[in-house]
Amino acid sequence: MRRQFLFVCIPIVLAVTVKAQDAAQLKIGGGTIDIEFTSSPAQPLRKMIVDWIATAARSVSTYYAGYPVAHVHVAVNVRDGRGINSGRAFGWEHPHIQIAVGRSTSAAQFSDDWTITHEMVHLAFPSVPENNHWIEEGLATYVEPIARARAGNLTQEKIWGDMVEGMRQGLPKSGDRGLDFTHTWGRTYWGGALFCLLADVEIRKRTGNRMGLENGLRGILKSGGSIAVEWPLIRTLQTADRATGVPVLEQLYEKMRATPVSPDLDQLWKDLGIKFDGKRATFDDSAPLAAVRKAIGGG
C-alpha cells in the first residue's frame, strides 16, 4: 500500500551497521536504508528483520539497476503475534516505509513475505493523482515477484502460477469502466498489474525483446521520477516510453483508461508458453513468446 503524504546483473554493495539498540543501517544499490524499531526485538528476531529488509532491497536494486531512492527510513513496529502486515510507503522529501512485524514471526514467514518488496517498489514511481492510483498498486503487484525471482528468491513456477491465478481478478466485471474510473480492489491491484504485463509483453514484441518495462521504469528514475515527487501520469508514461523508444505505455493507457478492456488471457498464457493446472505452472519453450516470458521473469 502506498500513500503520498507525510534482468541485468549489477554489483550491489551491502553493508550493515548497527547504530544503536533500536536501529540499524543498510547500504545497498547506492541507497541508504535506515531501520528503526519501535521496540527492541530479541537479537534473533532483529537479525531476521534486518536480513529480510536487505533481501528485499537487493531484489529491488536488481530490477531497477540500483536502489530507487538515495535514502529511505523504514519504521518497524514490533508487536505481539506472528506475521507481517500493515505495510505503507510514504513520499515527498523524505521517503519512508512503515511496516508491522509480529514477535513470533518465523524465518519461513520472512522468506515467503512479499510485503516489504512491494512497498520498496512504490519508492520507484512518482506520486500520481488519486484516480490513477491503480498504476501505483498495479506496478508494485507486478514488479514485486519479478524482482524477487530475478534476485533468485522466487521460482519461475511460482511467479507465473501466481500471475495466471491473479490476473483474472483484474478483468473488468459487468458495469465496470476503465482503470481511471473503477476503483475496486481487483481492478486497482490486479487490473493495474494486468496493464503492466500487457505493456511489458508489447514493449518486448516491438523491440525484438531488447527492451522491457523495467527499461521504461529505470528511465523514469533517471529523469527524477520517484515517490519523492508528484507527476501527472501522462508525463510519467511518456518519460518511460522515451526510454524504451516505443510509445506502448501511452497508447495502452489511452486504450484502458476509460474503457473496460478484457484481453484473452488464455491465449496470452499459451503464447508465453505457460500451462497451469491449478497447482503448478509448467512451461512450453517452443511457444511463440517463450523468450519474452524468460526475459520478463529472468529464467
Predicted features and spans:
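N-terminal export leaders
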Residues: R2-L6
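Bacterial N-terminal signal peptides
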Residues: F7-A15
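Boundary at the C-terminal end of the N-terminal hydrophobic targeting segment
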Residues: V18-A20
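Juxtacatalytic substrate-recognition/specificity segment
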Residues: D22-V128, N132
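Beta/coil-rich, acidic/histidine-enriched accessory regions frequently appended to metallopeptidases
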Residues: T32, S226-G299
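Soluble non-cytosolic domains of exported or imported proteins
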Residues: Q43-T55, S106-S111, T115, E130, ...
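Sec-exported extracytoplasmic/periplasmic mature domains
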Residues: R58-A65, H122-F125, P145-G152, D200-G208, ...
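Acidic/His/Gly-enriched intrinsically disordered linker/tail segments
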Residues: E130-D200, K205-T207, L213, R218-I227
